[in-house]
Amino acid sequence: DGSLVVNRPDALRNFNEKVSISLFPHVTPKTLISCAEKELRGFIAKQDKTVVKPLDGMGGKSIFIIDKNDLNTRSILEAVTSDFTKTIMAQTYVPEITAGDKRIHIVNGKHCEVLLARIPSETDHRGNLVMGAKPEVQPLSDRDKEICNTIAPTLVENGILFAGIDVIGDFLTEINITSPTGMREIDKYHQYSVSAILFNQLEKILNEK
C-alpha cells in the first residue's frame, strides 16, 4: 500500500540518463564513454564531427561539437572532463539534429502518438528549448516507433513507468527518467495530451492496488 512512486527508486540509481543508451547499441550513434585523453582523441579522429557532453548535465549545458581536426580539441576535452578526471560521453555527430532533437514519451511501456521536436536556432547547435530551440509537435516515424518498442520492455522490467527518450534522426541519444519534459509544450500546441495519458495510467494503477 502507501504512495505510488513513479519510476522505481533503484532505477534512478541504475539508469544514468546518458549511459543507459549503451544497453541498446544497435539503435544508438557510435558512442564512447571515457575520461582518458588517448581514448577520446582516438574516437574523435575517426569521426568527421563528434559531440561531447558530461554524463550529469541537463538543458544542453557543456555540450560541444568538435571537428576532426579542431585545434581546440584538447582545450574542450580538458574543460568537459575537468582535466581528464571526469568521465564524459562522446558521440558521432548526427547531422539530422538540424531537423530537431525529438522528445518521445513512453508511459508504462507504450509510446505516445506524437513527439516534440526541438529545432535548434540558427545561432546554436543545441536542440534544447532553454537554448532557444523551437518546439514543434510531430507524428512518430516508423523508426521512432521501432526505437520505442526496442527499449520499452527494459523500461517496464526496471520499474520505469514514465520516460522521455531523445531521438536524433534514426538514433537514440538519451533516456530521461528524472526530468522527461515536453508534456506541457505538446499539451499547448496539440490536442493530444501526454499528461492526460500519464495520469490516466497512474489512476488505473492505483485502482488496481
Which ranges hold each PLM region?
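Anionic group-transfer/hydrolysis microenvironments
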Residues: 9, 55, 93-94, 105, ...
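Short glycine-enriched loops at secondary-structure junctions
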Residues: 9-13, 118-120, 168-171
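Short glycine/proline- and charge-enriched loop/turn segments
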Residues: 25, 129-134, 179-181
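Phosphate-binding site of ATP-dependent enzymes
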Residues: 37-38, 45-49, 56-145, 155
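ATP-dependent carboxylate activation and anion-phosphoryl transfer catalytic cores
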Residues: 139-209
